[in-house]
């Protein structure tokens, strides 16, 4: 409704049709606004030159297509250019329940911008000798950086910002002696910082009252989290993802349990074989960065920090339940990195692979039977989830690639393709009798 209302009112900064004093539309779920801040919202650009209906189509299509492309590029980096695995993984990210159930809200936007920044950071260093590509990557940093900041949902934003910091610092350390810094770096980095800073100053001057009002609310502004609150079922709620498009969860809501698929327990237990040693140092660097972030997230979720330290680190804005979603995103990237690595380097002994499979089956079964998921799944479904989930892992561990692609692709389709219906046009809204009457009054 925000987006369509903006199109009807010529995209004002403050839409007077909402609330007593109007609604600041930059803060309102990244709605399209004729303002410089729209630079950071590329999926909204279509509203300005395609009209209301086609602009909305542009929003959905661009967000989906570009997220697939960004996910593909990030995974090509992580997997050392394994195209088939990267393509399946890109669809697994874009059509993950975590993204699809929150597609027009914070998660969809933040994952989009995070993937964009990860791509731009990497290629800025990796292709440093190509000045035109360096310039293009910094332009993407400006666009995605502005977009990331303006989502303004710290419960997810803070953790994903930490992931980006870990990722950037890791790349900076690795490439610091491999690139020759020059004047162009000073111009690009300095220019990007100044431009982003200028946009943020403009945003503050035009939206200060609305932003302060939001931050002074009980939720999310005054909420203070210290971490350390979790249940086993929350970590494994992605096990429900295949079912919730067809039957609503009975102990929460579908968006709260929607996560990214991953095999983090397996990767953690296999880490002595895949994360240590000097061979493939760049690839191991990326895996180590993701593992460190996952462990950082787990520490916050399970142990927590004193209030004063949580506030200094901004983690006070991050409830553990929200942190689990960010953790699952990084764990998904790590899992795909892991699969690519063991397909290239057969470093895990066969006997240990069977131990990993047994632990996986037991952890799935235990997580379901010792959580609220036990009342959502039937006994047959519980066993089926444990068995089929372990079978998918077996396909990955033993390198049965075609079977893995087939079954995992089917899982992605079932879990994500049926969440948001395909609709043609906006007639379902504007052709209704109440809508027509409202438009007459507005005229």
Describe these PLM feature segments.
Residues 131-136, 176-192, 281-286, 346-355, ...:
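Membrane-interfacial entry segments at the cytosolic side of transmembrane helices
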Residues 54, 58, 98-109, 282-286, ...:
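Membrane-helix boundary/interfacial segments in multi-pass membrane proteins
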Residues 201-286:
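Periplasmic/ER-lumenal interhelical loops and adjacent helix-loop junctions
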């Amino acid at each position: 409704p925000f987006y369509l209302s903006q199109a009807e009112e010529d995209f004002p900064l403050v839409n007077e049709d909402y609330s007593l004093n109007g609604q600041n539309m930059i803060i309102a779920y990244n709605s399209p606004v004729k303002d410089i801040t729209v630079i950071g919202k590329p999926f909204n650009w279509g509203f300005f030159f395609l009209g209301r209906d086609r602009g909305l189509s542009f929003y959905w299509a661009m967000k989906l297509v570009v997220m697939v492309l960004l996910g593909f590029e990030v995974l090509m980096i992580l997997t050392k250019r394994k195209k088939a695995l990267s393509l399946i993984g890109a669809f697994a990210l874009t059509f993950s329940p975590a993204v699809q159930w929150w597609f027009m809200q914070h998660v969809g936007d933040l994952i989009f911008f995070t993937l964009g920044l990860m791509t731009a950071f990497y290629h800025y260093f990796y292709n440093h000798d190509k000045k035109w590509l360096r310039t293009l990557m910094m332009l993407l940093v400006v666009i995605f950086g502005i977009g990331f900041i303006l989502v303004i949902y710290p419960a997810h934003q803070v953790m994903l910002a930490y992931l980006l910091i870990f990722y950037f610092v890791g790349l900076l350390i690795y490439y610091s002696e491999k690139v020759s810094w020059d004047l162009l770096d000073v111009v690009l980095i300095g220019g990007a910082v100044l431009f982003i800073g200028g946009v943020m100053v403009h945003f503050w001057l035009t939206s200060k009252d609305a932003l302060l009002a939001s931050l002074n609310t009980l939720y999310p502004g005054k909420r203070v989290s210290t971490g350390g609150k979790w249940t086993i079922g929350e970590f494994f709620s992605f096990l429900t993802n295949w079912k919730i498009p067809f039957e609503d969860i009975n102990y929460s809501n579908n968006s709260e349990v929607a996560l990214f698929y991953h095999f983090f327990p397996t990767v953690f237990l296999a880490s002595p074989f895949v994360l240590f040693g000097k061979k493939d140092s760049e690839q191991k660097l990326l895996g180590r960065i993701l593992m460190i972030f996952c462990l950082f997230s787990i520490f916050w979720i399970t142990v927590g920090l004193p209030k004063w330290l949580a506030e200094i680190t901004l983690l006070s804005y991050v409830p553990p339940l929200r942190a689990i979603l960010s953790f699952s995103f990084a764990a998904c990237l790590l899992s795909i990195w892991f699969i690519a690595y063991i397909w290239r380097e057969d470093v895990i002994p066969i006997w240990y692979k069977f131990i990993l499979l047994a632990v996986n089956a037991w952890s799935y079964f235990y997580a379901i039977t010792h959580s609220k998921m036990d009342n959502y799944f039937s006994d047959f479904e519980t066993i089926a989830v444990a068995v089929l989930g372990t079978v998918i892992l077996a396909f990955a561990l033993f390198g049965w690639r075609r079977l893995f692609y087939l079954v995992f692709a089917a899982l992605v389709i079932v879990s994500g393709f049926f969440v948001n219906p395909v609709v043609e046009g906006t007639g379902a809204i504007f052709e209704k009798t109440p809508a027509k009457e409202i438009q007459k009054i507005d005229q």
